[in-house]
């Protein structure tokens, strides 16, 4: 069987020979106006296959100018039928005219407009604004801290579950959870065993009823034995033969019922044992937790007592010594300031008297010049005597004030003596007014609450019934 291209080639050769002998050139019909405007395709090399010769070629993009298109013509895309018919007519004409197979043919080309390229200066369109609101774009703009926080919140439930599991492992509650699961399994087993017992009872009852009915019918046949017909004889033989089968079925149903009841009893006993074991383990676990809480309460109370003793034995005396030392330094500083002020007040009238004594000899210098040195010496001696007297008085006053302040300071006994503790207790319950900050008041309240809770826990632990 010859191929289609070979047959076409032979037909073209025969028609070409006939046309050459006739010497009658045949003109091709004129092309329509809408096909003349199609761009020409590049010629292809010779190919045996005619389908390859008429393959669609891609051409360059034609200028998209609407002004060049005539108004009275239509585009080729609107005349697909006319284009196909024209191609068929041209093929027939070429075949009749004897054109060689390697002649070039017109090919249809499809023109596609390239996609518009956005310019960089062009404003954002609706697509770009829509792209900015996409979840992926917003997710990429999130900070790393926000992503970590989201991941942590997503894993929070699993982390809490893992922490609870670790706590159960430490306290021993995981074994109790295993016992709970085992109890659920035993409950399912007991439920299935009871259902099996119910089915076995029904099967045993049906076997008994079937055998009883068979025996009842046999007894009826035996009562009218003298009037048996062939059908009755056959029926009696059948019933007598099935009696053994019914007996075996009844015995098997009874054994199955006994086994099902035994299994149900074992499942119930195992369930009761598991429940008792779980109750015992929960009691032990609760006792351990209560014991741990008791020891924790004792430890908290011991810490509070230790802090109280440390504050009363070490911190409180050190604070009192620091306050006393600071008070003494302030008193000494006040005494020094008072001494300096008294010294300045005493020196001011002495300087005024010396100035007045110096002015008087200057006025009398013209009258009596010889006795002037004697008077000057007398004045200087008097001033030195006054200064010595004033300095001695100031020192005596400062010493007296220092001694009086020291006498006014409270005598602090030793911190380990009985008098110090008696004085401290008396000071605790005295009516002395003092200024305290809110922080100190809050710390005292918290310490009192902790001490009260510790004492109440101790009392409850002691009077709790064993």
Curated annotation (Swiss-Prot):
Membrane topology term: Multi-pass membrane protein
Stretch list, region Disordered: 59-134, 366-388
Tagged with keyword Cytoplasm: no
Spans within the Mitochondrial matrix topological domain: 464-466
Coiled coil listed as a keyword: yes
InterPro entries documented for this protein: MDM33_fungi
Residues in coiled coil: 173-275
Function of the protein: Required for the maintenance of the structure of the mitochondrial inner membrane. Involved in mitochondrial morphology. Causes growth arrest when highly overexpressed.
Similarity-based family: Belongs to the SHE9 family.
Assembly and binders: Homooligomer.
Name of the protein in its database record: Sensitive to high expression protein 9 homolog, mitochondrial
Native species: Aspergillus terreus (strain NIH 2624 / FGSC A1156)
High-level lineage: Eukaryota, Fungi, Dikarya, Ascomycota, Pezizomycotina
């Amino acid at each position: 069987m010859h191929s289609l291209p070979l047959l076409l080639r032979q037909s073209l050769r025969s028609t070409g020979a006939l046309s050459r002998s006739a010497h009658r050139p045949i003109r091709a019909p004129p092309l329509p106006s809408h096909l003349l405007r199609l761009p020409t395709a590049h010629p292809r090399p010779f190919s045996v296959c005619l389908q390859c010769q008429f393959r669609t070629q891609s051409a360059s993009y034609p200028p998209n100018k609407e002004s060049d298109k005539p108004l009275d013509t239509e585009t080729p895309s609107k005349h697909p039928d006319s284009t196909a018919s024209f191609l068929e007519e041209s093929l027939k004409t070429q075949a009749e005219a004897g054109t060689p197979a390697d002649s070039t043919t017109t090919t249809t080309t499809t023109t596609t407009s390239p996609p518009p390229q956005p310019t960089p200066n062009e404003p954002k369109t609706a697509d770009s604004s829509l792209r900015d609101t996409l979840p992926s774009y917003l997710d990429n703009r999130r900070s790393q801290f926000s992503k970590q926080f989201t991941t942590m919140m997503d894993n929070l439930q699993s982390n809490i579950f893992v922490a609870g599991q670790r706590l159960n492992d430490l306290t021993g509650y995981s074994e109790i959870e295993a016992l709970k699961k085992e109890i659920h399994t035993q409950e399912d087993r007991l439920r299935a065993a009871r259902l099996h017992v119910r089915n076995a009872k029904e099967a045993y009852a049906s076997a008994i009823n079937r055998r009883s009915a068979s025996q009842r019918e046999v007894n009826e046949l035996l009562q009218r034995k003298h009037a048996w017909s062939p059908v009755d004889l056959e029926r009696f033989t059948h019933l007598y033969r099935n009696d053994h089968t019914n007996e075996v079925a009844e015995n098997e149903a009874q054994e199955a019922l006994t086994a099902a009841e035994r299994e149900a009893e074992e499942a119930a006993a195992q369930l009761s044992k598991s429940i008792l074991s779980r109750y015992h383990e929960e009691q032990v676990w609760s006792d351990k937790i209560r014991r741990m809480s008791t020891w924790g309460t004792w430890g908290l109370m011991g810490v509070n007592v230790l802090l109280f003793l440390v504050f009363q034995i070490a911190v409180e005396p050190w604070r009192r010594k620091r306050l006393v030392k600071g008070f003494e330094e302030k008193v000494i500083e006040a005494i020094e300031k008072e001494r300096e002020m008294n010294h300045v007040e005493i020196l001011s009238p002495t300087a005024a008297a010396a100035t007045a004594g110096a002015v008087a000899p200057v006025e009398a210098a013209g009258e009596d010049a010889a006795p002037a040195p004697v008077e000057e010496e007398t004045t200087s001696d008097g001033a030195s005597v006054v200064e010595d007297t004033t300095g001695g008085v100031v020192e005596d006053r400062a010493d007296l004030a220092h001694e009086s302040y020291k006498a006014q300071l409270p005598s602090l006994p030793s911190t380990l003596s009985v008098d110090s503790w008696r004085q401290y207790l008396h000071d605790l319950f005295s009516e002395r007014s003092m200024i305290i900050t809110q922080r100190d008041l809050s710390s005292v309240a918290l310490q009192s609450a902790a001490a009260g809770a510790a004492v109440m826990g101790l009392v409850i632990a002691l009077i709790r019934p064993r």
